Structure formats: C-alpha cells, structure tokens
Design a protein with these regions (language model features):
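Glycine-rich phosphate/pyrophosphate-handling loop used in enzymes and phosphotransfer proteins
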Residues: 1-218, 222-252
Length: 252
C-alpha cells in the first residue's frame, strides 16, 4: 500500500501537470485569437483537426491523375529526349489564377512553408494507396541556391518532399547542391530555360548514391528544364533511376 506521503506526492504531481496543461491551452487560445489559423485559400478559420487547408478547399483542389499512367502521360511526353524518362507525376493541375497557382504563390512568396508539407503528405497518401510506397529508396528535392534559400528562409520543394517522405515512409535526403545562381526561369523560352540551368547541379560531396532509386521533387513542372538538369546530375552520379514528382503541372 502507498503511504500518505506517496499519495500526497502523486496528487501534487497531478495537480501541477493539470495546471501546466491549462496554461498551455490558455496561451494556445490566446495566440489563436491574436494570430488566427486560417485556410490559405478561403481564409476561413481552421478547426483543430485541420492542419493547413480546410476540408472544403481540400475537396476542391484540382487533383491530377498522372499517377494512374506514370510511364505514359503528357508529362513524360514533354520530357522525351531530354533524360531517360521513367515515372513523371504531379499532384495538381496548374491553372493560371486558379487554386493551384494561389497555393504555390503563398507557399513561395508569403512565408507559408507548411503548405508544401501538407500537400506532400496528401499526395504521399494518394501514392501509398496506389501502390507506390516501395518504388523508391529516397526522396530528393531540387535545391535552391544558398543565397535564394537564405532570402526566402526555406526551400518550398524541400517542404513538399519532406511531406511525401513522411507519408510514404522513406527517407528524405539532400543529395544535390546548386552551385550556380541562375536567373528566374519565368518568361524564358524552352531553349533559354535549358541553357539557364545547364551544369547548375552537382552531388553533395562524399554522399554515395550508387544504385539508389530516387524520387526527385520540385514545385512545378513547366518545360521540365530544371528537373531534367537535376535528374541528369543524379543519374551521372550513379543513381539507378530517377522518377519525377511535382506539386503542380500542365494546364487546365
């Protein structure tokens, strides 16, 4: 039997734990009042169980089905002749002024890295349900130049990759570095984009990648120039295969 002293000690411990929990709940409610958690699309307040996007906006996302034909779709056709193409997939259809562009803009320019992780987790769950989990050994993101990453504070593609990594249960690794600072790809022709990123990426020194099956991720696939340049560095470094996945691609 426990002595009165032990019982009293347990009571004090429980009481302190309870008071601490109440304080944490108070401060959380206070912070939610001052800095409310809102859905980045509809701006409505999020419920406790909603991580980043509200349930309604999740249901309205322009989801693509490239993963149903990963070897033969409009994305693989776009990259034919640039690299040895395996699977090329994307979570969302991109449309100008649409939800996908809105999310990408807020992810990249409005300091909302959590959007990338949430989209990665969502897409990872979709891929897991469709039997993709055992296809890759590692998830790798197209890196930003250190100067650009320091200015933004994070790499949006890395956040997407880490979300995918968690849902698929495979490691995330920074296998690539961007050794040259390049101009933005926006408003460049396809040839100009290819030239702009030529020999931009290289492997992290001393990191073995021989025979690895890599899922290379980026935020958006337009001409595919950046992804192809990064994939080439991985393949030349010894990767067994490189599949490509992006948050958004194509048009609608």
């Amino acid at each position: 039997m426990q002595s009165n002293g032990q019982i009293y000690g347990l009571y004090i411990h429980w009481r302190l734990t309870y008071l601490l929990a109440m304080q944490l709940f108070f401060w959380k409610d206070f912070l939610d009042l001052i800095f409310p958690r809102n859905c980045p699309l509809c701006k409505q307040a999020l419920f406790e169980f909603e991580a980043c996007l509200c349930t309604v906006c999740k249901g309205l996302l322009p989801r693509a089905n490239f993963h149903l034909r990963p070897f033969d779709n409009e994305l693989t056709s776009k990259l034919q002749g640039l690299i040895p193409v395996h699977r090329v997939i994307a979570f969302l259809h991109f449309s100008k002024n649409g939800r996908s562009q809105n999310l990408l803009h807020q992810l990249k320019y409005k300091n909302q890295p959590e959007i990338g992780e949430e989209l990665g987790r969502m897409y990872g769950s979709t891929l897991d349900l469709n039997g993709f989990s055992g296809l890759w050994d590692v998830v790798v993101a197209v890196p930003l130049h250190p100067r650009k990453k320091a200015r933004r504070g994070y790499n949006q593609s890395e956040r997407f990759g880490r979300g995918l990594s968690k849902s698929l249960g495979i490691p995330y690794s920074e296998l690539l570095v961007r050794r040259k600072f390049t101009d933005t790809q926006t408003n460049k022709s396809r040839l100009e984009r290819l030239t702009n990123v030529e020999n931009v990426f290289e492997l992290q020194p001393g990191v073995p990648i021989q025979e690895l099956r890599v899922l290379l991720v980026d935020d958006i696939l337009t001409t595919g120039a950046t992804l192809c340049a990064a994939a080439t560095a991985l393949l030349e470094g010894g990767a067994k295969l490189v599949d490509l996945a992006t948050i958004a691609a194509g048009g609608r």
